C-alpha cells in the first residue's frame, strides 16, 4: 500500500495540472471628478476556455475586495492600441478585455458615473423683490399665528412680544412697498392720498369725501378729477342717471372700494351713453279706439306727426327716465294703425319707442264671431247717436 505521504504528493502535483482557471494581472485606474488616482493591480481568475478575462470577472474580484456597490458605481473601459496611439474602449459585463500588443498587460480605467439627482444649484433661482417681501411677511404671519395659538406653552408676556414683532414687521414691509411705489411713480400731486388701510381704519372717510366734493362744487364751476394713488386698487365706476341736472354735468358713483369722488364736465366731444329702449304697456277699450278713429279728421294727421317726432326726439335726447308714455302719442299711433285696412277688433299690448324716432306697435289679432262684432257695433256710442238722430 502506498503511504500517506505519497498520496499527498501526488494530489498536490496533479492539482495545478488539472486546474480549470487561469490567472491574469489587471491594472486599473479610478477617475473621480476628472482627477486620476494612483493605479491599482489585482489578480483576476478566468476560465481556461476564454481568450481573456471579462469585465464580469474583474467585478467579481473587486466585490470581494472593496464591497458590492463599488464596481457598479463606475463605468469601465480598457486601453487598446490604435494606429500610432492608444484609445479607451468602453466595456459591458460580458465583453473580453484585450491586452496591449506591446507589453501584453491588461489596463482598465474606471470613471465615476454621473448622477443628476446629486447635482445642486450654486444659488437659488432669482425672485423679484416684491415676491421676496410677500414671502417674508407671510412666513412671519404664519409663525406668529402658530406661536400665539399655542396658549399652553406661551406666557402672556411672550404673546405680547410676538404680537409687537408681528405688527412691526408688517408695518415695515408696508412702508417699504410704499417707498418703492413712490420712487417709480410719475404722479406729482400735492393732494392728500389715503391708503386702503386708512380707509378701513377711519370710518368717516365717505362723509369727508362728500363734504369735500360739495365744497368744490360751490367754489369752482369746473372741477378737475383728482389723481389716484398708484398703490390704490382699481375702482369700478358706473353712470347714475339723474332727471334734473344743471348744465351738462354727470355724476359718477363708485361700487366696491371707493377711493375718490370724481366729477367731470362733459365737453362737446364727450361720447354719450347709447339711448336705452323703453317700452310702455297699456290697454285701451276697443269702443274708445273706434270712437277716436271715427271722430278724428284727416286734416289733423299732419299736426300730430310733427308733435310725435318732436316728442320722441326729446325723449331720446333727454337723460331722464319716464314711467309712462304721453297720451297723445299713444292715441295717434293707434288711430294710424286702425285706419289701415278694414276695421277689426284689436287690442294693443305694447309700444316700443326707439332712439331713431321710430315707433312700432305690436297688435294681437284675434278672430271674432259675427255676433260679437254686431253686438260691439250696436252697443257703441256712435251707433246710438245715429239711431237717436233718425
UniProtKB/Swiss-Prot annotation:
Keywords: Cell cycle, Cell division, Cell membrane, Developmental protein, Membrane. GO terms for molecular function: protein homodimerization activity. InterPro entries: SOK (IPR010369), SOK_DIX (IPR048351). Its main location: membrane. GO terms for cellular component: plasma membrane. It is a peripheral membrane protein. GO terms for biological process: cell division; plant organ morphogenesis; protein polymerization; regulation of cell division; specification of plant organ axis polarity. It is found in: Cell membrane. SOSEKI proteins locally interpret global polarity cues and can influence cell division orientation to coordinate cell polarization relative to body axes. Homodimer. Forms long polymer filaments with other SOKs proteins polymers crucial for polar localization and biological activity. The DIX-like oligomerization domain is required for polymerization, edge localization and biological activity. This is Protein SOSEKI 4.
